């Protein structure tokens, strides 16, 4: 479970399912993302976004410089983290990152389609994909195989 850096806005103490959390106002720490979202809604914490912006920027840059037939690695929860970050931005701030992410996604989809049409998902490639991309890869692979079989079987 991915953790998020946060700053506490007030003194805090909680025990949820064996997770003990105690902090004073102003302290900085890391907690599971799901808990951070709940506490942020209750105005108990502030999520530290700078780390996420750096993380997203690095991922975008790695993909941009990767070879046309190679996918750069991203974390399993990349899109979840990116979307959580975007939700907290003001409209003016969202525009440039959303444009960059759309370009990133388009590039990755093109590569995934080519790779999935050619072969099943390898262990090495699986490590480079997010959860959503794995699902897309397997979907494309399955249906491209079915299409190839139907297209070729017409002549037998």
Feature map (PLM): residue ranges:
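Charge/polar-rich, low-complexity and marginally structured segments
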Residues: 51-156
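Compact, well-ordered interaction domains used in eukaryotic information-processing assemblies
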Residues: 11-53
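Generic hydrophobic secondary-structure signal
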Residues: 6, 23, 31, 39, ...
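N-terminal, Lys/Arg-enriched amphipathic/low-complexity engagement segments
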Residues: 1-14
């Amino acid at each position: 479970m991915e953790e998020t850096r946060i700053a506490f806005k007030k003194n805090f103490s909680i025990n949820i399912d064996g997770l003990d959390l105690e902090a004073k106002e102003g302290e900085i720490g890391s907690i599971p993302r799901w808990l951070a979202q709940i506490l942020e809604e209750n105005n108990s914490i502030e999520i530290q976004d700078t780390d996420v912006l750096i993380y997203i920027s690095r991922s975008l840059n790695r993909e941009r410089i990767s070879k046309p037939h190679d996918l750069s690695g991203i974390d399993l929860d990349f899109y979840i983290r990116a979307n959580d970050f975007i939700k907290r931005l003001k409209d003016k701030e969202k525009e440039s990152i959303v444009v960059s992410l759309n370009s990133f996604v388009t590039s990755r989809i093109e590569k995934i389609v080519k790779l999935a049409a050619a072969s099943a998902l390898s262990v090495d490639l699986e490590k480079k994909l997010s959860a959503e991309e794995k699902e897309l890869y397997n979907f494309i692979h399955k249906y491209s195989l079915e299409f190839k079989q139907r297209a070729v079987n017409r002549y037998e």
